[in-house]
Regions:
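Positively charged n-region of N-terminal signal peptides that target proteins for export
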Residues: 1-5
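Bacterial N-terminal signal peptides
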Residues: 7-16
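Carbohydrate-interacting regions of secretory-pathway proteins
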Residues: 21-233
């Protein structure tokens, strides 16, 4: 699905809300800048996540995730992130499981990757292995817009390096995910095997900071029970 079509779809959704008297969607904070309220630790430790000076700090150890309290279906996620270490690895999962059953400690879902720019050099990976890759993780499958195997690579490298803030705008509608990095849409996947689930922030070996985490919930679509992840216990 092209970006223009997706934007039109969102526009129609908003117009529908106005025409039918439904509350017009707006961005609402997922992080209050003071506490971890609204988030649930899944499989990390009490020292993994903390708040300092309005910033959500992730130590990077152990590997695992923290999830949102509720599930989301159609939405726009706005999030800023900054790596503190060269080659740092992290990400945010959308439409994710609320529990982890995999040996590598990460959930099934659609991952929006956040890699520090030196990652390919430090770990001797291909240049395409950079921030902004999108892919189905675990049991979740997607169709990449810009294939690198099962992953979708960004068409333009726009992320800033360690010590600098980056902004992701993640649009998730009816199994389609589109990613804007620092003000420009550069990647997408479609045909996700799940269309409703949790948001998860990832701890994966390096300190990373998050701030200004907001979500705009959009009207729901037609969805099968098999496309909704189970409620976490």
């Amino acid at each position: 699905m092209k970006i223009g079509i997706l934007v039109q779809m969102i526009g129609w959704m908003l117009l529908h809300c106005v025409a039918t008297g439904i509350e017009t969607p707006e961005f609402k904070p997922l992080f209050d800048g003071k506490t971890l309220d609204g988030w649930v630790d899944v499989n990390t430790s009490p020292d993994t996540w903390s708040v300092k000076d309005g910033v959500l700090v992730c130590s990077g150890t152990p590997i695992g995730v923290m999830r949102s309290e509720k599930q989301y279906e159609n939405f726009i996620l706005s999030i800023e992130w900054m790596h503190l270490e060269a080659g740092g690895n992290s990400g945010v999962f959308v439409w994710s499981e609320g529990e982890v059953f995999r040996e590598n400690r990460l959930p099934s879902g659609v991952e929006v990757q956040m890699l520090e720019n030196d990652y390919p050099k430090i770990y001797n990976r291909v240049r395409e292995y950079v921030s902004g890759e999108l892919f189905g993780a675990g049991t979740v499958t997607t169709i990449p817009d810009h294939p690198r195997g099962k992953r979708s690579s960004s068409v333009e490298y726009r992320c800033k390096g360690k010590g600098e803030w980056n902004h992701y705008l993640v649009v998730c509608v009816d199994g389609v995910v589109k990613l804007s990095i620092n003000g420009k849409f550069v990647n997408g996947v479609r045909g996700s095997s799940v269309k409703k689930g949790y948001l998860c922030l990832e701890s994966e070996g390096a300190q990373i900071h998050f701030r200004n985490i907001e979500i705009m919930e959009l009207p729901p679509g037609v969805i099968k029970a098999s496309e909704i992840v189970p409620l976490a216990k």
